[in-house]
Amino acid sequence: MIAKGSEPWLFTAASVTALFAILSRATDGLPFLNYIANVGMALTFVMVIFFRDPERKVETSDTYMISPADGTVIDIRDRKICIFMFLQNVHVNRAPISGKISEIIYKKGGYLPAFCKDSERNERNEFIIHSKYGDVRVTQIAGIIARRIVTYSNVNDTVEQGQRIGMIRFGSRVDVTIPHDFDITVEKGERVLAGKTIIATIKNDRDF
């Protein structure tokens, strides 16, 4: 399955590749055109891999939160987990908890490497999900290559845990806040999968 919002990129890459392939064939394999066509085929293939959106069986529960993104935990501070998505990771983001989207805040910004401290000033999109345990903030932060954050959900939408809520094109980062009713269960440097990895569990003394 290909991620929603990736169609323009794939169509452009495939169209340009096809054009150069036709020109190369029409000119009896002119080396320069043949080279461009081969590079285009390789880039199109890489994009197909990058924009993949595999189906995942999500086990939902009120007793834990799941990762909103594929990638590696690069920081944990002030009850916020920061996940860096490398180019080879799936870049579709999912709701870490069930609830209602009360607000979506988009901010323009720069395009510094998403793992840098200064990336706090990068382009970003913040979902505020109102859950039974309070507000959970999921922040998509664009990276050095990314130029547009794609949003799948809208304000007042009710989302289920693990539901797709958006995507960031190319290298990027996702931050998620953890309510005080939960204990964080991941560590810095740990690899996580969106919709699969448990990142926090309900405290034992919490009454349902």
UniProtKB/Swiss-Prot annotation:
It holds the Pfam family PS_Dcarbxylase. Its cofactor is pyruvate. GO terms for molecular function: phosphatidylserine decarboxylase activity. The record marks G171, S172 as: Cleavage (non-hydrolytic). One of its GO terms (cellular component) is plasma membrane. InterPro entries: PS_Dcarbxylase, PSD-A. It is found in: Cell membrane. It is a peripheral membrane protein. Binds 1 pyruvoyl group covalently per subunit. Its EC number is 4.1.1.-. GO terms for biological process: phospholipid biosynthetic process. Is synthesized initially as an inactive proenzyme. Formation of the active enzyme involves a self-maturation process in which the active site pyruvoyl group is generated from an internal serine residue via an autocatalytic post-translational modification. Two non-identical subunits are generated from the proenzyme in this reaction, and the pyruvate is formed at the N-terminus of the alpha chain, which is derived from the carboxyl end of the proenzyme. The active site is at S172 (schiff-base intermediate with substrate). NCBIfam families: PRK05305.2-5 (NF003685). Belongs to the phosphatidylserine decarboxylase family. PSD-A subfamily. Heterodimer of a large membrane-associated beta subunit and a small pyruvoyl-containing alpha subunit. This is Putative archaetidylserine decarboxylase proenzyme. It comes from Methanosarcina mazei (strain ATCC BAA-159 / DSM 3647 / Goe1 / Go1 / JCM 11833 / OCM 88) (Methanosarcina frisia).
